[in-house]
Structures are given as C-alpha cells and as structure tokens.
Amino acid sequence: MRDLIKRLKPTKFEEITALLALYRPGPLNSGMHDEFVDRKHGISPVTYPHELLEQVLEETYGVIVYQEQVMEAARVLAGFSLGQADILRRAMGKKKKEEMEEQREIFVQGCTKNNIKENNAEQIFDLINQFAEYGFNKSHSAAYALISYQTAFLKTYYPEHFMASVLSSELGNTDKIYALIQECNRMGIKVLKPNIISSNKRFIVNKDNEIEYGLGAIKGVADSFIKHVCEKRNILKFKDLWDFSKKIDIKLGGKKSLEALSQSGAFDSLSPSRSIAIASVQDMLKDGSNKNSISNLKSGDLFADFDETFDPYEKYKNIQDLTLSEQLEFEKKSLGYYLSGHPVAAIKNKVNRIRSHSISELTNDIKKSSLICLINSVRQIKDRKGKPLTFINFDDGTGI
C-alpha cells in the first residue's frame, strides 16, 4: 500500500478513494492498479470503451473501478433503469452463464437502440464484465478513504496525541499495544512506563509531549480501582507506598491489582526499588485494610499511630534489586510484553553474528532470513481439507 500510494502521488480525495478500491487481490493480480497509476501520470493514454463513457469513467482515467460505474455505464449506453443496472451488477458478480447471456442480450438490444453497433456493444459488454469482476462499492471506499485521510493527517501533524488515542483504543489487546509501542519507537515518540502518580486509565500526552502509559492496559488492575486512585490523587498526594495504602481503599483493588501495579513498575515512583514494591504488597493490603488507619485519615491525622522516626522500608533493607531478566519477566507477566528492554537485546553481540535480519528489517522481497526471537505462543488448527496449520507468534524486541 505504501509503495502504491507513493507511485500514485494522489492530488485529490477521489484518488485516495480509488486507491483503496484498487488495493485488493483482484485488481492487484489483474494489473488494474498499474494501469490506473500510468494513466494518472500520462505514461499510458486515457481511453474509453465508448465516447459516452467519458462522463462515467473520467474520474478514474478510463478504468472501471467501482460497481456504481458498471451500473452507470449500463444506464448511459443501454438505457437501463437503476433497478435493471443493479440486476446486471449482481449477475456479473455471480458469473452464472444463463443470467449473463440474458443480460448480454438485453444490454446489446439497449445499445443498438442508442445507435451503438451490435459488434461494438458486444465488445463493451465483455470489457465491462471483465472489470466488474473486481469492482468495489464506491460508497464503502469513500468512507474508508475519509478515515484514512483523517488518520494520516493526525498521525503526521499530531503524532503523540494520535498514537495515545490509538493505544487507548486497544487497552485490552496486548499484541496490538506492543505493536503500537514499536511504532511509537519508530516515530521517535517516548512512551513512559506506568506511574501511579501521573498515569490515567487511558494513554495520555504530558506537557513534554511524552505518552504516559495507561493503567487500564495493565493486566489484572480493576477499572474501579484505577478510577478511585485517580480521584484520590487529585486531592491527596502520595509520598510512599504506605501513604498510598492508607489514602485509598485497598479493597477496591485487592492483591491482584497491587501485584500487577508493582510488577509493571507503576509503584517505582513511591518505592526505593521495584523489588521492594513487589515484596510490600502483602503489608500494603494489611496496612490499608486496618480500620484504625481509616479513622486516622478521617480525623486528618494520618500518622497518629507512628513515630516520626519510623522507617516503613526498614524490614526490606536486605532485599536485592531485581536483575534485568527478573524485571523483564515481571513486565511480561503484568503488561503482556517486555517494556524496559528485551531478552534478545541482552545478547545483541551474539545475535548479530547469527541472524541475518531483525523483524523490523523484514520486507516482502526478502525470501529467506534467519531470525533470533522469543516464541510467545503457538496455535495449531486444521484447514478445510483437514491439513494441520501452525501459527507461531514471536518477537525480537523490534517487532512482532
């Protein structure tokens, strides 16, 4: 598609509409797209099967692209009503011999009444029939073209906000989010890790034009808990994990939400290390559900039961930081993919001596390649003939 649009160099909306109708297996295999491009740029002459069809096909340089053009051609040449033209369109689509012969006879008779020679009418019918096999509904193509134009505009001139919106539309789809994060990297857009202090449910753009990770994309975190945290955060500041656990209703999230948040790195801003945040989950649950803590909060004296010298992290001082491998595995568990890095990147020097390409470097013209990847999933099915098919999902940190 990118190659075709570069070759076409569309200068008006109608050409984007035609481009989408042409980029389908039938037109591509028939070479219609090449003929359209060549005629647009004057490489091939623009010709019409009959002079009466110039008004019908001028927009597409004499190439029959749409089903509506087939119907209009029948109306202009053979005097078909719109109802008759639609019957012709459907007959051409079904390719039933008896119906086609019947429609051919009606078409030729109509053309002769319009002073078009029978032999010429037969040739025109065959030509229309040939193109009708690939004709696409213009209204559908125009709708897709408008969306394509709008999204291309937004992606070009408002890339951060556009990508944040697209990411937010895929909150529950890990594979899509990972692919979109890769696209952000390619575009030079920085996507920050989850942060309980600044992240919202959806992906948003901050004042530095960076994308804040959406908490709703973390596996196992309840939407009601995210909403509650964001509401509390607007009126209360969180100083550390213990402060957080006392100012919010832990029960709304429970163990599952806290584990996912800590493993994804969302608590890094409130904890000395991610390993401590992960180890603190049970104590946060216990401390947050303490009724006395809630009463302290209501009375406005949050630390009434604590000595000012109390260090909540004292018991965790001997916990070692996570290794990169451990951190990545926790991210994989909570986010569905590796965010901070990738296991393949850790052995980059060895990998580069073995593989011929990274996934991001693969193109359709590469017939053979050696890759170093991690297999994410394997799915086996049987086709209609009962033959086994295997689908393997894998990635190397540059693509999936």
Which sequence ranges carry the predicted segments?
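Noncatalytic, beta-rich nucleic-acid-contacting surfaces in large DNA/RNA-processing enzymes
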Residues: M1-I400
